[in-house]
From Swiss-Prot:
<keyword id="KW-0456">Lyase</keyword>
<dbReference type="InterPro" id="IPR020888">
    <property type="entry name" value="RuBisCO_lsuI"/>
</dbReference>
<feature type="active site" description="Proton acceptor">
    <location>
        <position position="165"/>
    </location>
</feature>
<dbReference type="GO" id="GO:0009853">
    <property type="term" value="P:photorespiration"/>
</dbReference>
<comment type="subunit">
    <text>Heterohexadecamer of 8 large chains and 8 small chains; disulfide-linked. The disulfide link is formed within the large subunit homodimers.</text>
</comment>
<keyword id="KW-0150">Chloroplast</keyword>
<feature type="site" description="Transition state stabilizer">
    <location>
        <position position="324"/>
    </location>
</feature>
<keyword id="KW-0479">Metal-binding</keyword>
<keyword id="KW-0120">Carbon dioxide fixation</keyword>
<dbReference type="InterPro" id="IPR000685">
    <property type="entry name" value="RuBisCO_lsu_C"/>
</dbReference>
<dbReference type="InterPro" id="IPR036422">
    <property type="entry name" value="RuBisCO_lsu_N_sf"/>
</dbReference>
<keyword id="KW-0460">Magnesium</keyword>
<keyword id="KW-0488">Methylation</keyword>
<keyword id="KW-0503">Monooxygenase</keyword>
<feature type="modified residue" description="N6-carboxylysine">
    <location>
        <position position="191"/>
    </location>
</feature>
<dbReference type="InterPro" id="IPR036376">
    <property type="entry name" value="RuBisCO_lsu_C_sf"/>
</dbReference>
<dbReference type="Pfam" id="PF00016">
    <property type="entry name" value="RuBisCO_large"/>
</dbReference>
Length: 465
């Protein structure tokens, strides 16, 4: 067969509706919005080509390899209900296209180049199916849910956290004081804000020292294990590791990383260190909305969540369903289960396009944070269940009597909700009543109930843009 130069339609090579997907293929579901006049098969095939072996013209060197073995294939196209010019293109990628144990390489291939493609008006990666064979090349979360509970000796309830505010401007000593008060009042964790790294007003080493002091003092006084998410995110991987090593030397239980701004390579490096050295790893998703907020373009958060479980993290922020940050309930619960469970069935009503088996990767605790307070506690306990971290920043520090009473109020509200649930009461129906009853014997909770009695963050869903 002679080499035939020139441009030919992608669909001749990359649209293969007869293809039987293999157990080892990575499968992707893309929401494609083609330019007017571009047929769906051509657009779907273009996505498969540009994210695997294709380029814009036939090249002589195609003859030196086996395209059949290495090409991505668009194997199915389905229209999106209620959208005229949109459809879901399913693409299968042979496993050999990807480096083992590298989320970075997986994303560079699948979403690296194709999103700027001229034939498409918009493109969104809705979901990925990661095959068992590929998952087994990743360490995943440093410890996972069960090991974390055993380390902390805390069972049968969600864990409570609090982000220290104001996030920027406190000195290290005042910051440590706020940490101590929250932990002393009854929280399990406090947290560095995602943009607290090492700024002129508070260098990282000073903060680490004062926070460690706060942890040990509050542990001694409460008899409970406490933690503070020390943010190790830095400008270079070496500096990040230096901070993680210092945290380990202080003997604290947990560090933190901003995995999207820090990058997957840095994150996976840190996750490996955390497992080797017994540190838990809390993950913040700063920058996620840049990628996942638009309905037609970018990447859905469930893909970023799957990537994090592969790269490694023990906690990750996952929206609230009830607070100030958006999240539709079923969709949010879909990716919360993707983070926690070993096996998740395909369920389009929850946005899950593929059945996903996590083999033996540990689970990640979802963190609910953002505009939540004591009145939300019954809903949060009901929606997220025991395996979660409920994080109240303003909902702790905004208490009229101060940080420690704010922490007390949250802990009392949580214990009341868990107790009521265990007695068989319906939190969705009786939630407000349960909180009111508990506030009768907790003045701290009563004061919190009074401050936030009618606050609701209710706006139309943003996904309609």
């Amino acid at each position: 067969v002679g080499f035939k130069a020139g441009v030919k339609d992608y669909k001749l090579t990359y649209y293969t509706p007869e293809y039987e997907v293999k157990d080892t293929d990575i499968l992707a579901a893309f929401r494609v919005t083609p330019q007017p006049g571009v047929p769906p098969e051509e657009a779907g095939a273009a996505v498969a080509a540009e994210s695997s072996t294709g380029t814009w013209t036939t090249v002589w060197t195609d003859g030196l390899t086996s395209l059949d073995r290495y090409k991505g294939r668009c194997y199915n196209i389905e229209p999106v209900a209620g959208e005229e010019s949109q459809f879901i293109a399913y693409v299968a990628y042979p496993l050999d296209l990807f480096e083992e144990g590298s989320v970075t390489n997986m994303f560079t291939s699948i979403v690296g180049n194709v999103f700027g493609f001229k034939a498409l008006r918009a493109l969104r990666l809705e979901d990925l199916r990661i095959p068992n064979a590929y998952i087994k090349t990743f360490q995943g979360p440093p410890h996972g849910i069960q090991v974390e509970r055993d380390k902390l000796n805390k069972y049968g309830r969600p864990l409570l956290g609090c982000t220290i505010k104001p996030k920027l401007g406190l000195s290290a000593k005042n910051y440590g004081r706020a940490v101590y008060e929250c932990l002393r009042g009854g929280l399990d964790f406090t947290k560095d804000d995602e943009n607290v790294n090492s700024q002129p007003f508070m260098r990282w080493r000073d903060r680490f020292l004062f926070c460690a002091e706060a942890i040990y003092k509050s542990q001694a006084e409460t008899g409970e294990i406490k933690g503070h998410y020390l943010n190790a995110t830095a400008g270079t991987c070496e500096e990040m590791m230096k901070r993680a090593v210092f945290a380990r030397e202080l003997g604290v239980p947990i560090v933190m990383h901003d995995y999207l701004t820090g990058g997957f390579t840095a994150n996976t490096t840190l996750a490996h260190y955390c497992r080797d050295n017994g540190l838990l790893l809390h993950i913040h998703r700063a920058m996620h909305a840049v990628i996942d907020r638009q309905k037609n373009h970018g990447m859905h958060f469930r893909v970023l969540a799957k990537a994090l479980r592969m790269s490694g993290g023990d906690h990750i922020h996952a929206g609230t369903v009830v607070g100030k940050l958006e999240g539709e309930r079923e969709i949010t619960l879909g990716f919360v289960d993707l983070l926690r469970d070993d096996f998740i069935e395909k369920d389009r009503s929850r946005g899950i396009y593929f059945t996903q088996d996590w083999v033996s990767l540990p689970g990640v605790l979802p963190v609910a944070s953002g505009g939540i307070h004591v009145w939300h506690m019954p809903a949060l306990t009901e929606i997220f269940g025991d395996d979660s971290v409920l994080q109240f920043g303003g909902g702790t520090l905004g208490h009229p009597w101060g940080n420690a009473p704010g922490a007390v109020a949250n802990r009392v509200a949580l214990e009341a909700c868990v107790k009521a649930r265990n007695e068989g009461r319906d939190l969705a129906v009786e939630g407000n009543e349960i909180i009111r009853e508990a506030s009768k014997w907790s003045p701290e909770l009563a004061a919190a109930c009074e401050v936030w009695k009618e606050i609701k963050f209710e706006f139309e869903a943003m996904d309609t843009l």
